[in-house]
Amino acid sequence: MNGFVNWYTASVKRSPRLTNGIMTGSLFGIGDVIAQVGFPEKKGQKYDLARTVRAVVYGSLIFSIIGDSWYKFLNQKVIVKPGKHWTNTAARVGCDQLLFAPVGIPMYYGVMSILEGKSLVDAKKKIEDNWWPTLVTNWYVWPAFQLINFSLVPVHHRLFSVNIISIFWNAFLSFKNSISPSDKKVPVNFPPVPE
């Protein structure tokens, strides 16, 4: 593990966009595979490679760039009281959850809808159906983790640490994104989430 961390650290310092793009895209893809294999929407559903490719594209080309920039912004600009570590960390978590998450969630659903070849009207409907339940679920998952992430993890590793936890979050997002508006019931084999 130490060898991987050393390689990743050197790689992210040498070529941050490429490293973060590859890592984030890969982990978005893994999350989608988990969603498809572990929590299929319909019994006997076949694996959809194109769906995984869309997740990789979103993670690599969109989220990795925005996420990395966001974490750097938070670290450099969200300083409530210089020298007050926990106050600044709490402010960063607050910004992340009250500014980034409410925008990032509809961005995910909108972009994925477009990548699926759906219309803007369909994308809007997907966002309307999923934004609030996903945001509430986000608040159950992310604030505690981000408190640890922003307080203990160096800024150049924050996206990576988020990506590791995001494997399961991405599986959840992928599952939610795959449900059509007419599918209101969550399969019994999927962990319960607040809606």
Swiss-Prot record:
InterPro entries linked to this entry: Mpv17_PMP22
Membrane topology value: Multi-pass membrane protein
GO cellular component: mitochondrial inner membrane
Highest taxon of source: Eukaryota
Localization in the cell: Mitochondrion inner membrane
Keyword Membrane: yes
Listed transmembrane segments: 21-39, 55-71, 98-115, 159-175
Pfam family, one: Mpv17_PMP22
Keyword line: Membrane, Mitochondrion, Mitochondrion inner membrane, Transmembrane, Transmembrane helix
Secretion signal span: none
Function: May be involved in cellular response to stress. Required to maintain mitochondrial DNA (mtDNA) integrity and stability.
Family affiliation: Belongs to the peroxisomal membrane protein PXMP2/4 family.
Stated name of the protein: Protein SYM1
Organism: Kluyveromyces lactis (strain ATCC 8585 / CBS 2359 / DSM 70799 / NBRC 1267 / NRRL Y-1140 / WM37)
Gene this chain is encoded by: SYM1
